[in-house]
Regions:
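Conserved helicase NTPase motor core
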Residues: 1-96, 108-115
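Helicase P-loop NTPase motor core
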Residues: 102-105, 110-170
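ASCE P-loop NTPase helicase motor core
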Residues: 98-100
Length: 170
């Protein structure tokens, strides 16, 4: 890691995390610059909000908390779909958003257009075990569908062989 940081410095380069931190520090410490960008964008949209990290959350706050833009902020996210914890994402930003923006209207998207109800019932039973989540019940008009079969592989090689065999059966 030290060599990586040294290579960045030597090449006068930054990585994605550095870009975020530099932007946050600039906007946090420079009121005029912050006001410029708050005025530049009347609306802010953040998609996949459950996969934002602390720096991205603060960047959003710095840009949205402007008297002139009336906090015109639209975020889309679902704590149950967070998959980037290993990259610093924190699904709890969804709860922080509700705390920091108490006037925000929350719309639950529970209607599913892709899956059958059998699949959604399995998903509902799994996500019900997630902690610190917004309660919701996924549903569809696509019908019940066929039963879900579960296969537990011993390792990734066994899993790959199983998937290949299932594909061959198609």
């Amino acid at each position: 890691y030290a060599r990586y940081q040294e290579a960045l410095h030597t090449n006068n380069a930054v990585d994605f995390d550095d870009l975020l931190m530099h932007a946050v520090l600039l906007l946090r410490n420079n009121v005029e610059l912050r006001a410029k960008y708050q005025q530049k964008w009347q609306y802010l949209l953040v998609d996949e909000f459950q996969d934002t990290n602390a720096a991205q959350y603060e960047l959003m706050q710095l840009l949205a908390n402007a008297p002139l833009n009336n906090r015109n902020l639209f975020v889309v996210g679902d704590e149950d779909q967070s998959i980037y914890r290993f990259r610093g994402a924190d699904y709890r930003n969804v709860q922080l958003f509700r705390r920091d923006f108490p006037d925000a209207v929350v719309v639950l998207l529970e209607q599913n257009y892709r899956s059958t109800q059998t699949i959604l019932d399995v998903a509902n039973s799994l996500i019900a075990n997630n902690r610190n989540r917004t309660p919701k019940r996924l549903r569809t008009d696509n019908g019940q569908g066929i039963p879900v079969h579960v296969y537990e592989a011993y390792n990734e090689v066994e899993e790959a062989a199983f998937v290949a065999d299932e594909i061959q059966k198609l």
